[in-house]
Amino acid sequence: MWLAALALSAAGLVGIAVDEGYTQRAVPDPVKGTAVPTLGFGTTKGVRMGDTTTPPQALARALADVQQFEGALKRCVKVPLHQYEYDAYVNLAYNIGPGKSGVVDGFCESKRGGPSTLVQRLNGGDYAGACDAILMWKKAGNVDCSEPGNTSCSGLWTRRLRLQAQCLGGAQP
């Protein structure tokens, strides 16, 4: 289906909320610490340490964040997607951000400039390769979350494996 007709499904939004978890009070980001506090269901924009929220407010903010990431995804992806692929990619973009040339790697753009590996593969018609590229996002800071026995960020790796399977048409959010 063409991207213009797609929106994150209800199941996709629930998947993001479950993956991110809920925090009533702003907490340090697991990787960036207090420099990027997170609140509610993973919201970082405009959040300061000490901020608080309620579940309905957090869900509204998460939905606003989702819409921002959907916009970025729709600008960089040029091929049609199935709903399950779209939901997986929005979830990933929500977690890693869109990226910015010269600043940070992300879903759409690489730090080195140009599209991310995932987007290059996807726009080139390599749908399976794009799904596999989800697994490239396996680090939290300098920690490889895919390493067996890892206890500090194994949840991130589990999330990536689930998103890859979902993207390939397997597990649902």
Regions found by a protein language model. Give the residues of each.
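Surface-exposed patches in mature extracellular/periplasmic domains of secreted proteins
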Residues: 25-29, 73-87, 133
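Long, amphipathic alpha-helical surface segments
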Residues: 1-36, 47, 53-63, 99-173
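A general alpha-helix detector
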Residues: 68-72, 88, 114-117
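Solvent-exposed coil/turn segments that connect beta secondary-structure elements
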Residues: 42-44
